[in-house]
Amino acid sequence: MTMSSFLINSNYIEPKFPPFEEYAQHSGSGGADGGPGGGPGYQQPPAPPTQHLPLQQPQLPHAGGGREPTASYYAPRTAREPAYPAAALYPAHGAADTAYPYGYRGGASPGRPPQPEQPPAQAKGPAHGLHASHVLQPQLPPPLQPRAVPPAAPRRCEAAPATPGVPAGGSAPACPLLLADKSPLGLKGKEPVVYPWMKKIHVSAVNPSYNGGEPKRSRTAYTRQQVLELEKEFHFNRYLTRRRRIEIAHTLCLSERQVKIWFQNRRMKWKKDHKLPNTKMRSSNSASASAGPPGKAQTQSPHLHPHPHPSTSTPVPSSI
C-alpha cells in the first residue's frame, strides 16, 4: 500500500481525472515493476499507463491516436489554454462547442464527470481579461449612443450664451437647433401679420394723410347669374317697390342697398342708350322760351292784327 500510494503521488495524477478502475491497475503494476527502494522504478512513471491503453480505447471514442489520452491526462494546462480566448471572443457561435472533442475543450470524457470551465479573466490573468473586454467593447448596444446625443445638444446650445467668454452683443455663431425651432413650421398655429402697407387701397390718388385705417368701400362684383336676374327684372319694370326689392335681394344673396344702387345705375345707362333729354333741362328751356325778350314781344303785337277783316261787321254809332 505504501508503494502504490507513492507511485500515485509521483505521477501527479489528480483523483478526479482518471476513472476509478485505473487506481487498482496502477497499484498492481507498481508492486511488480519497482522495488521498495529501487531507483529505476521511480524514473519511469509513464510506463504503467501505456501498457493499459487498450483498456482505455473503448472509453475515448474521440481520441485520434494511442498517445492522445495520455496527453489529455498528463499534459500541462497551458496546452489547452488557447481555446479560452476563442470561446470568450465569440460567445454567440454555437459551432465551437460541437467542433472540438472532449479532450481538447476541457479534458472531459464520456466516462467521467465534466470539469467546469474557468472564465478567461481568471485563467489568463488581468492582462488577458483587459484584452477580452477591449475586444468585446464594440459589441455593446450601439443604438443607445445616438439616442443620448439629441438631449445633450440643446443643453450645449442653451449654455453657450451664458459663458463669460462670449459677450451678450457679440457676433457669436447662432445655434442651428435653436434656429430650427423658429422655422416657419413652428408658426403654423399663428395668424399671419398683415401690415398697413399690405392692405389694398381703393382710391384713385394716394392720400398722404391716410393713417392705415379702414380702406374705402370696394366695388361690388356681381356674378353672371345675379346680373341676368337683375336684367330680367329691369326689363319688366324699371322701378322697384320696397317689397319686390327685398325679395330680389333675398333670392340673389344681396343687400337691399346693392339692388337699389344697381337699378339706379341701370336706369342712367338706359337713358344714355336711348338718348333721351334730361327732364330737368327740358323744363328750364320751355320756361325761358315762353317768357321771351320784352321788346320783341311789343313790336310783334301790333303786327298780329294790323287791319280788321272786311267781312267782319262792326257797329257804327248813329250819332255821327
UniProtKB/Swiss-Prot annotation:
Coiled coil: none annotated. It comes from Homo sapiens (Human). Residues 215-274 bind DNA. This is Homeobox protein Hox-A4. Embryonic nervous system. Residues 19-77, 101-168, 273-320 are annotated as: Disordered. It holds the Pfam family Homeodomain. Residues 28-41 have a biased composition (Gly residues). It comes from the Eukaryota. GO terms for cellular component: chromatin; nuclear body; nucleoplasm. It is found in: Nucleus. A motif (Antp-type hexapeptide) lies at residues 194-199. The keyword Transcription applies. Sequence-specific transcription factor which is part of a developmental regulatory system that provides cells with specific positional identities on the anterior-posterior axis. Binds to sites in the 5'-flanking sequence of its coding region with various affinities. The consensus sequences of the high and low affinity binding sites are 5'-TAATGA[CG]-3' and 5'-CTAATTTT-3'. Changing G37D: In a breast cancer sample; somatic mutation. The keyword Transcription regulation applies. Keywords: Developmental protein, DNA-binding, Homeobox, Nucleus, Transcription, Transcription regulation. InterPro entries: Antp_homeobox_Deformed_sf (IPR050609), HD (IPR001356), HD_metazoa (IPR020479), Homeobox_antennapedia (IPR017995), Homeobox_Antennapedia_CS (IPR001827), Homeobox_CS (IPR017970), Homeodomain-like_sf (IPR009057). Residues 52-62, 159-168, 310-320 have a biased composition (Low complexity). One of its GO terms (biological process) is embryonic skeletal system morphogenesis. One of its GO terms (molecular function) is RNA polymerase II cis-regulatory region sequence-specific DNA binding. Residues 139-153 have a biased composition (Pro residues). Belongs to the Antp homeobox family. Deformed subfamily.
